[in-house]
Amino acid sequence: MKAPVLFSILLISFLSICRGENQAKHLFILSGQSNMQGHRPDEAFTPTVGKAFGKDNVIVLQDALGGQPIHRWWKKWRDPQGKKPEESGDLYDRLLSKVKLAIDGQKIASISFVWMQGERDAKMKWGVLYEKALVGLHTQLAEDLNWKVSDLAFVIGRLSDFDLKNKKYPHWSMVREAQVRVAKSTPKFAWVNTDDLNDGKNRKGREIKNDLHYSAEGYQILGQRFAEACIQQI
């Protein structure tokens, strides 16, 4: 093979590699409480967004903790008496530190924030505060990532049909409604239905019906729905 031809092939290969390394990534941030903690991105979410954009072009980061109210993420949250809780924004700081580490040195094409939470706030009767908190959390994340608020996609997992009569969690319906209102407030927001995900066998093999948490299959479907909703926003 002549030297000029060989050089051209090597140059094209090198440029292709460089383009791959410099390709802007699609960032997906997943957070919330137990039903997000039970979700495993590798089962459905990551493969789905990877298929849509290329597995090397996506960054998926999940950080969640069960049983936690939204004020562990949104720092401006105040209780009905106007008091700041002792634990305020600490889980958000943990999440943000992981996000910044994951995107260090990367070019970002889009950011999608996926949120599955609200059970604790419904139980604590903080439903009246939830809509403001959701919007505030989204804005807080956009600002901390230096991203335009209107360009940050927001996908919300609506609370399931676990306690529609509000017996165990007095503000269950209130939080559900707040989630939908926020999701419908701007084109970059969306909500995902979970009403059919809490029947069947859980991850321990126990049969569940209309449970607080989802079945093993339900978590896989949840990941698929989250991914599809994100893809539609990008």
Predicted regions and their residues:
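Sec-dependent N-terminal signal peptides
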Residues: 4-14
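Mature, extracytoplasmic segments of signal peptide-bearing proteins
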Residues: 16-18
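Cell-envelope and extracellular/periplasmic
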Residues: 20-234
